[in-house]
A protein has these predicted regions:
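Short loop/turn segments that connect beta-strands within beta-propeller blades
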Residues: 47-49, 90-94, 160-164, 206-209
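Repeat-solenoid scaffold signature
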Residues: 93-96, 105-107
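Beta-strand-rich domains and repeat architectures in extracellular enzymes and scaffolds
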Residues: 7-41, 177-179
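A short helix->beta-strand "capping" segment at the edge of beta-propeller domains
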Residues: 1-13, 48-49, 166-168
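Blade-terminus and WD-like Trp-Asp/Gly-His loop motifs, strongest in beta-propeller folds
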Residues: 18-24, 63-70, 109-117, 178-185, ...
Length: 248
């Protein structure tokens, strides 16, 4: 048996973020980019039991299947500083078409809130400072998969394709951890925090105004989804437990 070498890991393909809609199957193929200490991502489509590359830029990790003919994704192909573009790409071939540009980096499209309004999400820095060092004064200040989180918050936006208006749903120190669109409304978990992040997050609903759906109280909502018209939560009380241990 051969031992596993670094080159084996660098050539390994990480598949994820599979989405299926209207018979369309799209997923992300990630490969390590050693020189950049990062990953290169490619959107791939499964059609007639064959896999096709949709993108080749190496930066597209998030996307939304618009219909059986096209997908939406965000990127910065023109390398404009502090900017994100929204692209539409036909599944039957052709170049991605830019349909919007935002003066915010790292935007990711979640889907349609209604027929002319999209929901987007991005990680934003609370205070813009030009400095050659970083002051960590929040807990947590770093998280695996996210990088530095100190003085950064995940924010939600809506974008009207007709009026070109970008509206911030959550702002300031509010931090979004999970978001889904269901039945014409935006549901998300998160909390407003400074200095130290709490364990418990509420579930909110946005349909033009914000309302609280579930008050977490003593339970931390890890994830949520909708099944057969019902809201399903995975939550934790953060009580200590061990193998075969009953907390009662």
């Amino acid at each position: 048996m051969k031992s596993v070498e670094i080159n084996d890991l660098l050539s390994y393909h990480f598949y994820g973020n599979l989405k299926v809609k209207d018979g369309v199957k799209v997923f992300v193929d990630g490969v390590a980019a050693e020189k950049d200490n990062a990953y290169e991502y490619t959107l791939k489509c499964v059609k007639d039991d064959k896999v096709y590359d949709l993108t080749s830029f190496g930066k597209e990790a998030g996307f939304y299947i618009e219909n059986e003919n096209s997908v939406l994704f965000c990127g910065n192909r023109k390398n404009i500083e502090k900017s994100t573009s929204l692209y539409r790409l036909a599944l039957n071939g052709g170049e991605a078409k830019e349909i919007a540009r935002f003066d915010k980096p790292g935007m990711n499209v979640l889907g349609y809130l209604n027929e002319n309004t999209l929901v987007l999400m991005t990680k934003e820095k609370l205070v813009e400072e030009e400095s050659d060092y970083e002051v960590f004064d929040e807990i947590p200040f770093y998280m695996n998969g996210q990088g530095i989180t100190n003085k950064h918050r995940m924010h939600l936006y809506t974008y009207n394709l007709d009026t070109k208006e970008l509206v911030c749903v959550t702002e300031g120190t509010f931090d979004v951890s999970n978001a889904k669109i269901h039945d014409g409304a935006l549901y998300y978990t998160g909390q407003n925090w400074t200095r130290k992040q709490a364990l418990y997050e509420n579930l909110y609903k946005y349909d033009g105004s914000v309302s609280t759906v579930v008050d977490a109280k003593e339970r931390s909502i890890q994830s949520f989804d909708f099944m057969d018209g019902k809201l399903v939560l995975i939550a934790s009380t953060h009580e200590k437990y061990g193998l075969n241990e009953n907390p009662k």
